[in-house]
């Protein structure tokens, strides 16, 4: 793992670079390859991108191994930032005493009235804040995040309203945002209004290595459980596309 303080992270290209939040999952990997396309990939192989991942003692830490491999496919720099797990209490993804919900009947019924226990308190707020500070300090002009509001409507930090509010905060709370030059750091969410089927199709169209991705919240010996919300949504997406999941 490379230090964030490495001066080589500074974006020196005419078209300023981007930080991409990369979990190692299907959505963030597709988002990464869309960012790469925005910067001229595959014709341009020297991409001004920095992949940023977080180790917060999540149960599915295998996603970090996947994120390393995915970043290497583009030859871009990759940082894994360690966070104290005490930041993220009250979630089934971080606390062993809380079981990840399985086979949730409300997932597709429209009866979801409560926030799932897989929600991690303030996670995207913290992740985006780290990325924003890193972007401003190192000269990147945008941040890509692969949230989508349709599949994860139960998560408050995946909604369009949240992204809009964070963009306003970035405009008001950074030097770039208040400089009056009109070049504030932009939060880009290319998957925000897409379902899993559309994300899979989009990922395939830009050459994203979906076979390297990991989505399961509660893996068993590194293998998907097949029953958590994320596994079910992923399986449904590939079924609708009519393809076998390349990660299985």
UniProtKB/Swiss-Prot annotation:
Its cofactor is Zn(2+). GO terms for biological process: queuosine biosynthetic process. Keywords: ATP-binding, Ligase, Metal-binding, Nucleotide-binding, Queuosine biosynthesis, Zinc. It catalyses: 7-carboxy-7-deazaguanine + NH4(+) + ATP = 7-cyano-7-deazaguanine + ADP + phosphate + H2O + H(+). GO terms for molecular function: ATP binding; ligase activity, forming carbon-nitrogen bonds; zinc ion binding. It is an enzyme of class 6 (ligase). PANTHER family: 7-CYANO-7-DEAZAGUANINE SYNTHASE. Catalyzes the ATP-dependent conversion of 7-carboxy-7-deazaguanine (CDG) to 7-cyano-7-deazaguanine (preQ(0)). This is 7-cyano-7-deazaguanine synthase. It comes from Leptospira biflexa serovar Patoc (strain Patoc 1 / ATCC 23582 / Paris).
């Amino acid at each position: 793992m490379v230090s964030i303080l490495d001066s080589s992270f500074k974006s020196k290209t005419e078209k300023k670079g981007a930080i991409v939040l990369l979990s190692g999952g299907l959505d963030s990997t597709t988002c990464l390859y869309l960012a790469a396309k925005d910067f001229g990939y595959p014709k341009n192989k020297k991409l001004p991108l920095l992949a940023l991942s977080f180790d917060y003692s999540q149960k599915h830490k295998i996603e970090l191994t996947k994120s390393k491999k995915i970043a290497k496919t583009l030859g871009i720099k990759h940082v894994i930032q360690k966070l104290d797990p005490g930041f993220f209490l009250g979630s089934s993804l971080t606390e062993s005493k809380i079981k990840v919900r399985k086979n949730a009947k409300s997932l597709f019924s429209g009866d979801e009235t409560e926030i799932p226990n897989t929600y991690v308190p303030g996670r995207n707020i913290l992740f985006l804040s780290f990325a924003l500070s890193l972007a401003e300090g190192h000269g990147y002009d945008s941040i890509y995040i692969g949230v989508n509001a349709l599949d994860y409507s139960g998560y408050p930090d995946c909604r369009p309203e949240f992204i809009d509010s964070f963009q306003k905060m970035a405009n008001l709370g950074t030097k770039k945002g208040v400089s009056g030059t009109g070049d504030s750091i932009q939060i880009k969410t290319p998957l925000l209004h897409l379902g899993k089927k559309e994300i899979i199709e989009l990922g395939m169209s830009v050459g994203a290595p979906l076979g390297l991705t990991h989505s399961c919240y509660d893996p068993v010996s590194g293998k998907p459980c097949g029953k958590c919300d994320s596994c079910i949504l992923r399986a449904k997406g590939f079924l609708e596309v009519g393809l076998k999941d390349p990660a299985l």
